[in-house]
A protein has these predicted regions:
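Conserved, structured C-terminal
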Residues: 1-190
Length: 190
């Protein structure tokens, strides 16, 4: 992930530049065989790599020969995805929080968004197509907490004037880019 992702990976697979965003292909050289997709979870250009367990250490060593590659952990990934407004399954999107409620209707192809007999077949279509047509009760929003402490998953959100609970934080953390805490939450649309 990041501005040098293609440069780093092209040291191992020269044809990686042919891979467009959201495309994937199997690729091999004399040392490695991988399934690579051009996608990511940080808001940056990047690649997802599936490789045999036996090859992981050698593959990683080859990657780390590039001067621009730096290891990061899940904390960095999480702050980047929060800054980009990307959902984490299990937090911002669950079996109970549908794509329309998570502001992800765009991920459902337009041809599948019509309530027709041919579209009755994907999991959750009865609920999801009804929400697309009639609206949702809850929506996902970005939040800037007051103060320096991040609002964490499960924190309750209250309307400031009435004191009525209107939602729940689904993800939260500190944004290094903004130098402040940020969160996403699910609030009552009313």
């Amino acid at each position: 992930q990041g501005p040098f992702a293609q440069d780093v990976l092209s040291n191992i697979f020269t044809e990686i530049s042919k891979l467009n965003f959201l495309d994937s292909f199997e690729i091999s050289n004399q040392d490695f065989s991988c399934l690579i997709s051009r996608s990511g979870y940080t808001g940056e250009d990047g690649f997802e790599i599936s490789i045999r367990n036996d090859d992981v250490a050698n593959f990683a060593n080859e990657l780390f020969k590039h001067k621009h590659l730096k290891p990061i952990g899940l904390g960095a990934r999480d702050s980047l995805r929060l800054e980009a407004g990307l959902c984490l399954y299990g937090n911002d999107l669950t079996k109970e929080i549908t794509p329309p409620e998570a502001a992800l209707t765009w991920t459902i192809h337009k041809s599948r968004q019509n309530n027709t007999p041919s579209n009755k077949g994907f999991l959750g279509s009865d609920i999801i197509l009804n929400q697309i047509k009639n609206g949702v009760k809850y929506i996902r929003v970005g939040l800037f907490p007051i103060g320096k402490a991040p609002m964490r998953q499960g924190s309750e959100i209250y309307q400031s004037k009435s004191g009525v609970k209107i939602g729940t934080v689904t993800s939260g953390g500190f944004s290094p880019t903004l130098n402040r805490p940020i969160s996403m939450g699910r609030i009552d649309k009313a």
